[in-house]
Amino acid sequence: MSDERLETLQEIGTAFARTRPPEPDTPMPAQPTLSDIFNLRLNTPKFGLPIAAAGHCTQSAAAALAAGMDEETVLACLLHDIGLAVARPDHGWWGAQLVEPYVSEKVSWAIRYHQALRYYADESVGYAYPQMYVKMFGEDYQPPEYIAAAHEHARQHKWYMRARNITLFDDYSFEKNPTWSVEPFTDIIGRHFRQPKAGLGNDASPTAHMWRTLIDPSKPL
């Protein structure tokens, strides 16, 4: 190997290495649980967002619980924006895929399709198009075709209200520093979230790699 090539490879290695301290994430337990994810990873804003997913999601779940929704709807509200801890675009799809091995099909379906439904008002159930989106996208915004197709599919589906309920209990005020806790949902999580014994990210599920990314996003490779 030439000296020039060796130098190039070393430069690339340096670029991929942890050249700065990782994000100030608290170390995770050896066998991470969903509550650990909320308390230690979703507790801080990601990807430039002004709020943390934990506060927003627990507010949504609390609203659903107070309204007397069934436990799977409450869990779907609790998890609906967990995908934002992995990626901002298409967070509904990311979130649904992330939790799919651990929840019922109803819950993951609702999480997946809430993203499309949030762009479309449904006056019959009291859901108005959020003013926040007018500010984000403009008065005449038209969602892309895949969002429109997902909305139409969900609208005709027997589980439509599963996803629509997430939008109804979404908190569009998005408080910046809400007081929140995942503890009120511990029993619901225990009954409806299949926690792997090895811990999230350590099991052989199809999405274990996604949990590992969420847990340690600053790994070089």
Model-derived features with residue positions:
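Metal-dependent phosphohydrolase cores
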Residues: 1-78, 82-221
